[in-house]
């Protein structure tokens, strides 16, 4: 059972939560998100707090879904209130990025430019041709798109060239040792 899920989720001002049938919907200044609820959890809204508890009919490990849905709802609340952002930096000679309409155009050292469609609900911007900023209200969508962009050219361990998250540590390897002439 999750220890965090024992605490209620406090709703910031301007965020509303509503539950209809098996679906929770969170609305805030940045937009709205919905999530289908599992039968193993019960959600209660009291004032400006949301409580997540295991359902009474669940006998086998009653708290196993409680932590998951607590985290999902907390991320929804944070997303509609402040939003999420992932920043990627491109390191390498000739590496560039540009946003063209609903496409992210990457020049990453291959013979052709790589074009990636930007999912709806995300805002992508490029600074200084090498810094990509991905913003949105859905934490999963922001992280998934950032991981897809990074996967196009992950940083290599010898020179560190590639696409990496901002402030990501890339473990470096030593190159081949120079010939010494000894036999």
UniProtKB/Swiss-Prot annotation:
Domain of life, per lineage = Bacteria
Q: Output the Gene Ontology cellular-component terms.
A: cytosolic large ribosomal subunit
> Which UniProt keyword terms apply here?
Ribonucleoprotein, Ribosomal protein, RNA-binding, rRNA-binding
GO function term, MF aspect, one: structural constituent of ribosome
A single Pfam family it belongs to is Ribosomal_L6
Q: How does it assemble?
A: Part of the 50S ribosomal subunit.
The record's similarity note reads: Belongs to the universal ribosomal protein uL6 family.
Q: What is this protein called?
A: Large ribosomal subunit protein uL6
Q: Which organism is it from?
A: Chlamydia trachomatis serovar L2 (strain ATCC VR-902B / DSM 19102 / 434/Bu)
């Amino acid at each position: 059972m999750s220890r965090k899920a024992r605490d209620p989720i406090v709703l910031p001002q301007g965020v509303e939560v509503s539950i209809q049938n098996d679906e929770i919907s969170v609305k805030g200044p940045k937009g709205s998100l919905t999530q289908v609820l599992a039968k193993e959890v019960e959600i209660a809204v009291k004032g400006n707090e949301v409580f997540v508890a295991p359902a009474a009919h669940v006998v086998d490990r009653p708290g196993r879904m409680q932590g998951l849905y607590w985290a999902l709802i907390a991320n929804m609340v944070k997303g509609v209130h402040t939003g999420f952002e992932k920043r990627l930096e491109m390191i390498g000679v000739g590496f560039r990025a540009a946003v063209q309409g609903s496409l992210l155009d990457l020049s990453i050292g291959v013979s052709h430019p790589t074009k990636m469609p930007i999912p709806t609900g995300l805002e992508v911007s490029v600074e200084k041709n090498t810094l990509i900023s991905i913003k949105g209200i859905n934490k999963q969508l922001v992280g998934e798109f950032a991981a897809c962009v990074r996967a196009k050219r992950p940083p290599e361990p010898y020179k560190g060239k590639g696409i990496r998250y901002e402030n990501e540590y890339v473990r470096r390897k030593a190159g081949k040792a120079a010939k010494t002439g000894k036999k």
